[in-house]
Amino acid sequence: MSRSLIERRLTDVSQRLRRVREELALLDEQREVFTDAAEDARVRSLVSETPIAHREYEEAQRHADAMDRSRRLLLGQIAELSATQDELLDRLVVSSD
């Protein structure tokens, strides 16, 4: 692979990695809100002991769980992109020798 192609791919991967990290930061903020809401709903459910409060808790917890799944996916993407970036950097070093 030519040096210029490696550099282009490295730039692309770096930009994608930055975007995914920004998305993760935003998701973490949203996740905190959903987790807090689920915890509040759980406490209300325990205190009120009504079916409606329990359903509200379950719904809030589903949202928090969905955020956790999304976070795991983003972390996986970050790991893949980081590995690709490392591989490209290794190739760049080898091609410059």
Q: Model-found features: residue ranges?
A:
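Short, glycine/alanine-rich amphipathic alpha-helical segment
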Residues: 47-70
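Short, charged, amphipathic alpha-helical segments
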Residues: 11, 29-32, 54-62, 78-84
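N-terminal acidic leader/helix
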Residues: 11-16, 22, 26-29
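Amphipathic alpha-helical coiled-coil segments
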Residues: 21-24, 63-84
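Short, charge-rich amphipathic alpha-helices with coiled-coil/heptad character
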Residues: 1-17, 89-97
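Extended alpha-helical coiled-coil "stalk/arm" regions
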Residues: 27-52
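Amphipathic, non-membrane alpha-helical segments in soluble helical-bundle scaffolds
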Residues: 3, 24-31, 75
